[in-house]
Amino acid sequence: MQKQEKIIEMFNQIAPTYDKANRILSFGADVAWRKKACQRVMSLYLKKDLKIADIACGTGDMIEIWQESALKMEKNILNIKGIDPSSGMLNVAKEKFPNVEFIEAGAQNLPLESQSLDILSISYGIRNVVERQKALSEFARVLQKDGILVVLEFTKREKGGFIAACRDFYLKNILPSIGGIISKNKSAYEYLPNSIEGFLSKEEFILELKNAGFEILDYKSFSFGVSSMFIAKKL
């Protein structure tokens, strides 16, 4: 089995308990991070009528937050799609949001027309894409000119110190144990800290975005650098 296929199968296995584990393991902070990202995008992008796709949508958390943010910012979502390669995750998403279109597909080969989107989001999923540069090229293809890409991700820590040490201890020792109890799949939650360590620094990922044809509009780190938000415009 190829690396990408193994990652997808891992998410299939933990899909039934994924939402519960996320809320517990992040102490609910992941919802706040998502809301801040969506609201920031809505404030930067002036169009009122929006076509949105959430890539690596998982169980659909960002779909709901996009809808709430649009209502709050008095914008109209003409169309919103969730795309994910994990059938297990999509089964949960479809139960939660029966009126939303969900598509089983990978980020590196999106079944979307070129220049068809105003906004594309991917939350805590880009580090799981093996062919990352190909995915970024796809994001640029499906976005309209001046369309917005927003990425939320756990990035490699850049500084040491007490807080960084606490973060690392939690990720490597506590999170896998709790995640394993909730999901009965400890190895899936051991994958998380390993995937973060194997991902890019903030500067490295920004360079990849620029090379893919994006201009960085905003960057912000949350919770002492645990999570990072990248907002970019397609040139």
Curated annotation (Swiss-Prot):
CDD domains: AdoMet_MTases
Annotated S-adenosyl-L-methionine binding sites: 59, 84, 123
InterPro entries, per database record: SAM-dependent_MTases_sf, UbiE/COQ5_MeTrFase, UbiE/COQ5_MeTrFase_CS
Reaction catalyzed: a 2-demethylmenaquinol + S-adenosyl-L-methionine = a menaquinol + S-adenosyl-L-homocysteine + H(+); a 2-methoxy-6-(all-trans-polyprenyl)benzene-1,4-diol + S-adenosyl-L-methionine = a 5-methoxy-2-methyl-3-(all-trans-polyprenyl)benzene-1,4-diol + S-adenosyl-L-homocysteine + H(+)
EC number: 2.1.1.163, 2.1.1.201
Pathway: Quinol/quinone metabolism; menaquinone biosynthesis; menaquinol from 1,4-dihydroxy-2-naphthoate: step 2/2; Cofactor biosynthesis; ubiquinone biosynthesis
Pfam families from the UniProt entry: Ubie_methyltran
Record-linked SUPFAM superfamilies: S-adenosyl-L-methionine-dependent methyltransferases
Gene Ontology biological process: menaquinone biosynthetic process; methylation
Gene Ontology molecular function: 2-methoxy-6-polyprenyl-1,4-benzoquinol methyltransferase activity; demethylmenaquinone methyltransferase activity
Membrane-spanning segments: none
Function: Methyltransferase required for the conversion of demethylmenaquinol (DMKH2) to menaquinol (MKH2) and the conversion of 2-polyprenyl-6-methoxy-1,4-benzoquinol (DDMQH2) to 2-polyprenyl-3-methyl-6-methoxy-1,4-benzoquinol (DMQH2).
Family from the record: Belongs to the class I-like SAM-binding methyltransferase superfamily. MenG/UbiE family.
Protein name: Ubiquinone/menaquinone biosynthesis C-methyltransferase UbiE
Taxonomic classification: Bacteria, Pseudomonadati, Campylobacterota, Epsilonproteobacteria, Campylobacterales
